[in-house]
């Protein structure tokens, strides 16, 4: 009888440990979904948010935040340079089009297709659509996240082949280089 209780106790312990791992994975998946939704809700429709508010540490990785800050600073500096120039009617270097999406026009809708978590990184495949033109445009971008000591942060976005850049960091770096 004691062996039966011992076996039952060990079995219940192992089952409860496995259940916690599944719940932990589910909660990580939920946190990542929320982070990606926050990203596209705040920055997906317009580049105005980039210029009008500080880049949050809670959303972007330190590496991506640094590149974003450099690009914003370069753009604002060029805006001021043009204003003070002999030709203030010239167009300064500003972010044009949807910088966080493959399609210049941006998107009218998106859906998270999959989340792949491996150690401290995650890849989120996003299906986008732009239905304000005929035919409707569809494409897939991949959001890359890293799990920092402060939680999941967006580290890069790999663009679909319809985009004019390989990824977000490359696009921002090219932008900064064009201001020099």
What is the role of each PLM region?
Residues 28-47:
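Short, aromatic-enriched amphipathic alpha-helices that serve as compact interaction elements
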Residues 61, 67-134:
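Surface-exposed, charged secondary-structure patches
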Residues 112-114, 141-147:
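Hydrophobic/aromatic beta-strand elements that line small-molecule binding cavities or substrate pockets
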Residues 13-16:
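C-terminal motif of bacterial Sec signal peptides marking the signal peptidase cleavage site
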Residues 18-20:
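Bacterial signal peptide processing site
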């Amino acid at each position: 009888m004691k062996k039966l209780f011992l076996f039952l106790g060990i079995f219940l312990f192992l089952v409860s440990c496995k259940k916690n791992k599944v719940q932990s994975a589910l909660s990580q998946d939920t946190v990542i979904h929320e982070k990606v939704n926050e990203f596209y809700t705040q920055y997906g429709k317009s580049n105005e948010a980039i210029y009008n508010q500080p880049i949050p540490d809670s959303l972007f990785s330190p590496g991506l935040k640094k590149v974003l800050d450099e690009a914003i600073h370069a753009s604002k500096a060029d805006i001021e340079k043009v204003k003070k120039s002999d030709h203030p009617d010239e167009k300064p270097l500003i972010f044009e089009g949807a910088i966080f999406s493959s399609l210049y026009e941006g998107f009218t809708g998106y859906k998270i297709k999959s989340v792949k978590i491996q150690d401290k990184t995650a890849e989120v495949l996003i299906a986008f659509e732009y239905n304000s033109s005929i035919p409707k445009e569809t494409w897939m971008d991949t959001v890359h996240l890293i799990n920092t000591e402060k939680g999941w942060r967006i580290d890069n976005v790999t663009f679909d082949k319809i985009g004019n850049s390989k990824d977000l960091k490359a696009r921002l770096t090219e932008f900064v280089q064009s201001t020099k």
